[in-house]
Amino acid sequence: AIGETTFTGPEDLINPEGWFTIEELQRAALQRCDNARDAIRLMGSLAEPYGYGDGGECLTIADRNEVWQFEIVGIGKDRIGAAWVAQRVPDDEIAVSANIPRIGKMKRRDKDNFMASDNVEQVAKDNGLWDGKGTFIFWKAFNTDYAKGKNFNDREYFILNHFAPSLGLTYEMDELPFSVKPEKKVDVRDVMAMLRETYEGTDFDMTK
């Protein structure tokens, strides 16, 4: 199963001459792959040489055993290619993405939990999105003003804090964890409740 959310990313990375949109990458993965890891590898192997023509996108990819988050951007208005990263959601944890890139530090040596194209850091450098100093953080490099300098908005914060309140997460933090371990089992009804939440009675109340 594959879910999708758009984070757009810097417009200077978008080249509509790229062959693949996110829908086409998803279609190819669903047709040809029976697990999340192979789906990620296939999408990367198609988008890198033939080009990715969309804005920044995030896919949540689930198979019978694992769930991964895959984030992808173009590499420049006049360049054909793609830069992407994927992170595995740990067993017994939950993750959420709502129009904001969520993956932070890329631990390339941890192949059980991370995958990425070889060019991610260089694309960020080439486009003035990272100065090459310090730890490279994917979401910081490829974010937009919508996120206001963070890797979350009210939706990510509300859900993560709801299921793991003892972590003491606050909206004032600059960064929230990629995933959290819920303090009680989460079922389908819990997910449905979160998706229809209007945050009534909170600072994010949508009913006012």
PLM features per residue range, with description:
Residues 20-24, 54-56, 79-81:
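Short, solvent-exposed loop/turn segments at the edges of secondary structure
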Residues 40, 64-67, 79-82, 96-208:
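C-terminus-biased signal that marks the final domain/tail of proteins
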Residues 8-51, 100-124:
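Compact, glycine/acidic-enriched structural inserts
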Residues 56, 92-97:
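Acidic/polar low-complexity flexible segments
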Residues 6-8, 74:
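A mature extracytoplasmic/lumenal domain signature
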Residues 1-4, 68-69, 95-96:
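Short hydrophobic-aromatic micro-motifs
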Residues 42, 46-68:
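Gly/Pro-rich turn-and-neighbor structural signature
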Residues 62-65, 72-76, 87-92:
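Short acidic-glycine loop/turn motifs at beta-strand connectors
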